[in-house]
Amino acid sequence: VLFRSEGELTAVYSVGDTQYGKDDTPAIIQRMLNAIDDSVAHHIFLSSKYKIGQIALPQLGDCIEGMTSQKGKVMGRHDIGVSEQTRVGRRVLLAQIKAMAQLASKVIVPVVPGNHDEVQRFLVQHANDSWALEVAAAVADICVENEFLKDRVEFRFPATDDLTLAVDLSGTLYGMAHGHQSSNLIKWWT
């Protein structure tokens, strides 16, 4: 364990639009690993000043490039296939969780789907038929089997057909939605 603080506050480290598989996956992975290292360092700094007992790692959609956007034309720029994109997504999310779980007594991983994560678009489907949710669900299964993580990490998913999620983080309601849902945010929020 690097450093674990106890307290009432929640630190939030959000991730979205990684789009593994888009053009240069090795560079995207490296940026994410660097961001994880930076988050650990920043959290240690914050914990020296504030009583942070919980960490939230919101996953805000588009973890993979997928094959549905632009009527499938995005596949022409893939450097890895969809199954490998989800594999990368699982491995990076697990790395993030393992790094941050050493720093707090509780880690919450709320997840919402994005548009690139859609499994398909040619039939009407449930909104939660999403590669982003599948990546997180697979990592949740791994965490349940891990002695260190099983009681420390909690995943939160939207209800069937919901694209949004709200979670209570230390008394603050934290709402999440992927940005593809609105072209006019002011109108969308009202």
Predicted regions and their residues:
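Short acidic, Gly/Ser-rich segments with clustered Asp/Glu that frequently serve as metal-coordination loops
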Residues: T18-T25
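His/acidic metal-ligating clusters that form di-metal
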Residues: K98-P110, V119-L123, D129-T190
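Core catalytic region of metal-dependent phosphoesterases/phosphodiesterases
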Residues: E6-A11, V15, I29-I142
